[in-house]
């Protein structure tokens, strides 16, 4: 047992949560104390201590409004903390997380889900670092100045690329600043480029195993081995199409921001989370238990019911039986690694 394992063995971490997208929508509609009133009870009930909250920019804000939308989300988080003092805290490193947890609060960290807010201005990456952002996803599932993202399903397109020259600069500057790179949503070429140009551990915050669910959003066995060899961690994503194999046809909610997704073949008569254990065991068989955690990607709380069907867990309270079963399926130290200490090892690297 390492020092991190021992110090944080009861900590539960979700490395990818689209909380601020919902906070933005609800505050724009006039709601206040959004996190406290709509989200925190479920998070606490599930025993989740640390949330990495993404700064995601919908297409409608691009290209001109990407920076402003990201800053709006950060500003609204600070408004939420003022309105709900003592319930949750914005953290930037392991020391702040430990203090927050010891005070009985939920710890929130920030991640860029795509570098659209900085455009092609590298100085803005430093600005986001100073604002407390500590994780950098180079791209969502689209092209930007840094890289090509992968698609959820096959589309007609021209030749895809990996990292651009600017993307290489982002990789180098992020690591210089002490930020952690996130390869979820990158295409295979961009993943290989990150492996080539980065020097430090990187993560895949919300990606599963492609050998089990064959989508470009998941990692191949070779990618998992490369990520593990670098000391990284991957987070289990709760989207059904990334947990299970898919069948013919597509499903999505009307007027959704999500792309059309293939229908997931979910086994009947078993919990919807059953498929997660295939991914966990596959990763452990490949690289051991030190490189898998949670990255649930819960973005369904205020979405239509038809869109919630795309998720294993509509809300955090639905994760409770799964998190509890982790402790029964795996030895104590392995269960602790999956629940949170693997992610804490990464967070300990933050400055």
Show which residues each predicted segment covers:
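Histidine/acidic residue-rich metal-binding segments in metalloenzymes
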Residues: 120-130, 134, 152-203, 216-231, ...
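Mid-to-C-terminal alpha-helical segments outside catalytic/metal-binding sites
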Residues: 2-6, 314-351
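Conserved, mostly hydrophobic/aromatic
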Residues: 16, 43, 93, 132, ...
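Aromatic-lined glycan-binding groove of carbohydrate-active enzymes
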Residues: 220-259
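Structural preference for beta-strand elements that scaffold enzyme active sites
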Residues: 10-14, 50, 107-111, 134-135, ...
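Short catalytic helix/loop segments, enriched in acidic residues and glycine
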Residues: 28-45, 315-319, 323
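A metal-dependent hydrolase metal-coordination microenvironment
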Residues: 37, 42-122, 126, 141-145, ...
């Amino acid at each position: 047992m390492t020092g991190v394992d021992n110090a944080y063995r009861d900590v539960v971490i979700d490395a990818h949560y689209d909380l601020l997208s919902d906070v933005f929508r609800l505050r724009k509609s006039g709601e206040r104390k959004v996190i406290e009133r709509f989200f925190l009870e479920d998070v606490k009930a599930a025993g989740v201590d640390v949330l990495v909250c993404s700064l995601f920019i919908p297409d409608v804000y691009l290209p001109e409004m990407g920076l402003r939308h990201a800053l709006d989300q950060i500003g609204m988080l600070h408004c939420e903390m003022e309105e709900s003092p003592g319930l949750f805290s914005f953290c930037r490193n392991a020391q702040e997380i430990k203090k927050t947890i010891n005070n009985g609060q939920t710890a929130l960290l920030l991640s860029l889900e795509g570098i659209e807010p900085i455009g092609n201005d590298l100085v803005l990456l430093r600005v986001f670092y100073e604002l407390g952002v500590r994780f950098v996803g180079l791209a969502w599932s689209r092209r930007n100045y840094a890289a090509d993202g992968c698609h959820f399903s096959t589309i007609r397109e021209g030749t895809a690329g990996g990292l651009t020259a600017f993307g290489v600069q982002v990789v180098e500057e992020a690591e210089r600043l002490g930020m952690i790179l996130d390869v979820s949503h990158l295409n295979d070429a961009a993943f290989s480029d990150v492996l080539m140009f980065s020097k430090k551990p990187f993560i895949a915050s919300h990606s599963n195993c492609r050998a089990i669910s064959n989508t470009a959003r998941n990692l191949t066995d070779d990618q998992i081995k490369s990520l593990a060899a670098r000391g990284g961690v991957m987070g289990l994503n709760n989207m059904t199409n990334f947990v299970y194999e898919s069948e013919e046809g597509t499903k999505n909610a009307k007027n959704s921001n999500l792309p059309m997704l293939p229908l997931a073949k979910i086994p009947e008569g078993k919990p919807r989370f059953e498929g997660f254990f295939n991914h966990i065991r596959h990763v452990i068989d490949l690289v051991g238990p030190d490189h898998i955690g949670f990255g649930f990607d819960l973005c369904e709380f205020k979405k239509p019911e038809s869109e919630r069907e795309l998720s294993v867990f509509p809300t955090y309270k639905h994760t409770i039986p799964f998190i509890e079963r982790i402790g029964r399926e795996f030895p104590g130290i392995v269960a602790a690694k999956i629940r949170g200490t693997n992610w804490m090892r990464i967070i300990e690297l933050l400055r």
